[in-house]
Amino acid sequence: ILKDYNSYSNENLLDFYLLTGGVAKYIELFILNNSFDLKSMIDTIIDPNSMFLEEGKNRLIEEFGKEYGTYFSILALISDSKTSKSEIESILERNISGHLARLENDYNIIKSIKPINAKPNSKVQKYEIVDNFLAFWFRFIFKYQSLIEAENFDRLKEIIYRDISTFKGKFLEKLFIELLKEKQTFTKIGSYWERNNQNEIDIVAIDDIDKKVLICEVKLSEKRLNYNDLLLKSQKFVQDYKTYEIEY
């Protein structure tokens, strides 16, 4: 689509993926508004007449029913990198086991993720919002609802531009994981971390047939890549793959 409209670049591709997740309705609205880069897409979303501003509420309030406030609070925290059950419960000061289970199994809005080599009964896990736009909506629109109500759209855009790089990083990881899966050369692809989010590795791809492991650090800027740091973080992980060829 971006190539069709002479707007293709790596950055525009990531932004388009971040804000649409491939959902046809969102893509059509951006095409209609000739919005193919981050600024024009944000201008389309953060507009007094934009359907995007109420999208999260319109999609979810009726589905969640009277407990929508709790569900929205959980999703807002997950979108803001509070991704473990213990983190969320400490902030909300209540048990949310049932809510997380329903969000994942009944509503299919979140999914739980475990480290790539975790045992089946491991309780080390995180949650992420499946829908790209909903993740953005909870992170920036729901969180700053007061600015929208005050019609302070310029201030909201400033906040989005200020914080979007950190938010983008997780979606760049997600995009690369999807691209690696499309290659169909690995038997397992995921992320790795140890307890308390220690030694977090963005992407690990394992080929159990040819005995190869690919360990990746994903950054928006090449200057932020640190090869030695990646070697240190992967020390414990690679102990389980001593007979494998390791590539960084």
Task: List the predicted regions and their residue ranges.
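Amphipathic alpha-helical "lid/sensor" segments that cap RecA-like P-loop NTPase cores
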Residues: 5-61
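Short amphipathic alpha-helical interaction segments
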Residues: 90-108
